[in-house]
C-alpha cells in the first residue's frame, strides 16, 4: 500500500503540470488579456460584457496582430509606448511565455499565488473570503442528496422492475439530463418574482438587514435564500447516488448470505438493514469524498451567477471575463490539487472499508 500511495503522489506532479500547462497555453491563444483590459478602459472601449469576453471591442489577444501605430495591442494607437511597456511589466508580459509559466509553477509549489490584477487583494484571501458561500452550497447539496438518494435507492432495489422503479428512474434521468441552471431559471420565473409568485429572494445569500436579525431569524433568512439554489442543484445530484445505491443493493440481495438469512426466518427489514445494508453501502460511502468535491466545485458556477451568490464559482467566472489571470490559475491549481488528493483519499477509504482491496501489483 505504501508503494501505491507513493506512485499516486508521484503521478500528481505531471498531472498538475499538464493541467496548468494546457490551460496556460489556451490562455496564450485566447483573445484579450489584462493589458487589453486597461487599454480598453483608457481608450473608452470594451464596456459591455460581450466586449470583455472577446477581449474588449476589437482588441486582439496577447499574441494578436498589430495596429496601425505598430503596437501589438489593437486600440492602443495614440498611447505612449512607455505606458504600454509599464503595463506589460506590471502584468508580467515583458517576459517570454515559458519563463512566466515556470515562475508561476515555482510560486505555486510554494503556495504563493500572488495578487489579483484588479481586486487589490491576494488570491488566497479572495478564495478564503468566497469559500463559505460555495462550502454552504456544496455541504447542503451533499447532505440532501445522500439523505434522499440512499432510501430511494434501497426502495428501488427492493421493488426492481415495478411501476415505482420505472417512473422514479425516468424522473431521475430527466433531472440528471437537464442542466441545473435551467432549473434555476425556471424556479426564478415561477417563485422569485419572475411571472408568477414572489415567494423567495432573487439574489444573495442573506438579506441586507441580516446583522439586525436575532439568531433564529438569521437561520430562517439563510435557508430562505438558499432554497431555490439548493433545489436547482439537488435535482441533478440525486441520480448518481440513487442508481449506485440501487445497483449495489441488487448485487448484494442476490448473494448466498441473504438467502441464508431469509431461510433463518429473519424479517425482510432485518435482512436489508442488518445484513445487506452494511455491505451494499461500502461503495457509496467510499465515494463520499469524490461526491463532496463534485458538489463543491462543479455544480455551483452557473447557479452562483444566476442567483448572484458571491462564491468561488462567481469569482472564477468574473476572473475569466476580466482576464484576472492570477485568480484563474490560482483557483485552477488549488482545485486540481484537491481533486487529485481526494481521489487518492477515496481509494484509501475503499481499502479501509474492504481490506480485500490493496491495489498491489501481482505477477501472473
Curated annotation (Swiss-Prot):
Residues 131-350 form the ABC transmembrane type-1 domain. The lineage of its organism: Bacteria, Pseudomonadati, Pseudomonadota, Alphaproteobacteria, Hyphomicrobiales. Gene3D superfamilies: MetI-like. It is found in: Cell inner membrane. It comes from the Bacteria. This is Peptidoglycan transport system permease protein YejB. Signal peptide: none annotated. Part of the ABC transporter complex YejBEF-YepA involved in the uptake of muropeptides, the breakdown products of cell wall peptidoglycan. The import of muropeptides into the cell enables peptidoglycan recycling, which is vital for cell wall integrity in this bacterium. Is also probably part of the ABC transporter complex YejABEF, which is likely involved in broad-spectrum peptide import. Responsible for the translocation of the substrate across the membrane. It is a multi-pass membrane protein. Its main location: membrane. One of its GO terms (biological process) is protein transport. The gene is yejB.
